[in-house]
């Protein structure tokens, strides 16, 4: 079973899911909104595009050269 495919179909059924994962590429590819936590503190939330553009997320979590 392809879990990514299942997750992509959940919004059509008006269902949501909470994913906790360190694989940012896979997670941002299937989510509508993301919440980024660093050292127990919420540092950013928004659409995948907003997360990718967030300077603090880049500095703390992704690095400047991160690309999807």
From Swiss-Prot:
GO terms for cellular component: cytoplasm; plasma membrane. Its main location: cytoplasm. Keywords: ATP-binding, Cell inner membrane, Cell membrane, Cytoplasm, Membrane, Nucleotide-binding, Translocase, Transport. Gene3D superfamilies: P-loop containing nucleotide triphosphate hydrolases. It is a peripheral membrane protein. It is found in: Cytoplasm; Cell inner membrane. The keyword Translocase applies. InterPro entries: ABC_AA/LPS_Transport, BCA_ABC_TP_C, P-loop_NTPase. It is an enzyme of class 7 (translocase). It comes from the Bacteria. Belongs to the ABC transporter superfamily. Outer membrane lipopolysaccharide export (TC 1.B.42) family. This is Lipopolysaccharide export system ATP-binding protein LptB. It comes from Klebsiella oxytoca. The gene is lptB.
């Amino acid at each position: 079973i392809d879990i990514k495919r299942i997750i992509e179909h959940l919004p059509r059924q008006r269902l949501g899911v909470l994913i906790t994962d360190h694989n940012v590429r896979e997670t941002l590819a299937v989510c509508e909104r993301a919440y980024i936590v660093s050292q127990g503190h919420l540092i950013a939330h928004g659409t995948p595009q907003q997360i990718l553009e967030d300077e603090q997320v880049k500095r703390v979590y992704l690095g400047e050269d991160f690309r999807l």
